[in-house]
Structures are given as C-alpha cells and as structure tokens.
C-alpha cells in the first residue's frame, strides 16, 4: 500500500543525515524503503544504514541542484515508478520520525499531506496587513505567484504523504500547468511542494483532498 521514498544525491552525509536514516531504519523498516538516487551514486552507504532498502535510479542531471530536484518531483517518470503503491511517503534526510502512524494517515484518504505553512501573527499587524494587501494586488495584476497563498496551507514536501495515482494522473492530464512550473526560474514559490499544495486545485476538476492545517500539524511540523 505504501512505500517510503528517500531522495538522495550524495553519500557525503552529515551527522544529522545519518541520525535521520538510522532512525528511519529503526522505526520504519517494516515498510518498503526506496532510495531515489542518481545513476552514478553508489548505494553502499545507504544499504549499510537501511539494510532492507532498495534503489530507484534516475539520470544524474535530475539531481543537479534544487531546480532539477523540483522538476523530478513533478515528472511523470518519477510517479510511474511507484504506481504499484497507493501512497508514497517522501522522507528527506533532514527529517526525524518520532513514531509510526503511517498506516493511519494512509487510511484517512488524503491526496497530499505535509507540514503546514503556518501564518505568523506578525502578518496581522495593521501596517503589515496593509503592505500585504498591496502586495497581493500587484501579484495578481502582473500574474505573479503570491506567498500569501501559502498561509496555513498543507504543506512542506520534505516529509509528505502522496497519493501516487492522483499525482501521476494530474501530470498526464495537465502537462501545460506542469510545464509552467518546471520552466520557471528557480524561486521558492515555484517549488514542487507549492505546486502540489496549491497550484493543482486551481485547474483540477477533481480536486486534491488535503487535511486542514490544524490536522496536518499532527502529521508533521517544520
């Protein structure tokens, strides 16, 4: 039903990366653990840290920086590899998992779950609120992305549960929407998690289902 997918681009791991992967192996090794990596990267260290893991290789250029990674996570070929599962849990190596509640989250029927981007209280101060209204007007006028759309939305892709078929089908059905993001200049509002959290339901006649931001805090926090 679900696999844990760990994207990696190097085996020069920090101490925190190693702690993260050891914890993953300790708590979650009864699930399939799949490392997504460049073709040229040796699997040896990852196999040592997570002995039951398997590997999916992609061309090296798909890991050549943040932009390339974002494009990989919006690509048909990525989700196609995991169509044998209903869900994948993306687990980047800066995550730390406290306990296993994965199956209970899979059973809730959401299409995407990640740590919510909580709106900070400072944005409700009168001066800041006025500034944000002007900013929103200008972004709409010039058809630019608006960071205010992220407030209390779900959420961060670093630890995220994704319905594989829903993601795969959207990419196939709306290639021009995907292309607008993949061809945009590197900017955080064009990141893949913004795409899956916000952009898809601007176009999708069959909307993605997300938890509200309070519920999502029980899944993960950033």
PLM region spans:
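Membrane-proximal basic amphipathic "stem/tether" segments
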Residues: 1, 123-149
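Short, charged/polar "capping" segments at the starts of alpha-helices
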Residues: 12-16, 39-46, 102
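Short, acidic, metal-binding catalytic loop of nucleotide-sugar glycosyltransferases
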Residues: 20-31
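Short beta-strand-to-loop acidic/aromatic patch adjacent to the donor-nucleotide binding site
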Residues: 85-97
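Catalytic core and acceptor-binding pocket of nucleotide-sugar-dependent glycosyltransferases
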Residues: 141-222
């Amino acid at each position: 039903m679900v696999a844990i997918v760990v994207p990696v681009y190097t085996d020069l791991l920090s101490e925190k990366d190693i702690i993260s992967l050891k914890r993953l192996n300790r708590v979650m090794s009864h699930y399939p653990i799949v490392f997504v990596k460049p073709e040229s990267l040796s699997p040896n260290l990852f196999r040592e840290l997570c002995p039951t893991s398997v590997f999916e290789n992609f061309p090296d250029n798909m890991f050549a920086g943040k932009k390339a990674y974002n494009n990989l996570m919006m690509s048909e070929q990525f989700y196609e590899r995991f169509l044998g599962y209903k869900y994948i849990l993306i687990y980047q190596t800066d995550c730390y998992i406290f306990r296993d509640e994965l199956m209970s989250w899979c059973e809730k029927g959401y299409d995407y779950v990640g740590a919510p981007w909580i709106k900070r209280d400072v944005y409700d101060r009168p001066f800041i609120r006025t500034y944000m209204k002007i900013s929103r007007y200008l972004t709409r006028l010039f058809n630019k992305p608006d960071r205010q759309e992220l407030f209390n939305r779900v959420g961060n892709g670093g630890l995220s549960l994704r319905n594989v078929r829903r993601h795969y089908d959207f990419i196939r059905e709306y290639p021009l929407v995907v292309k607008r993001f993949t061809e945009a200049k590197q900017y955080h509002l064009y990141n893949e998690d913004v795409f899956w959290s916000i952009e898809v339901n601007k176009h999708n006649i069959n909307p993605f289902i997300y938890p509200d931001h309070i519920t999502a805090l029980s899944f993960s926090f950033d």
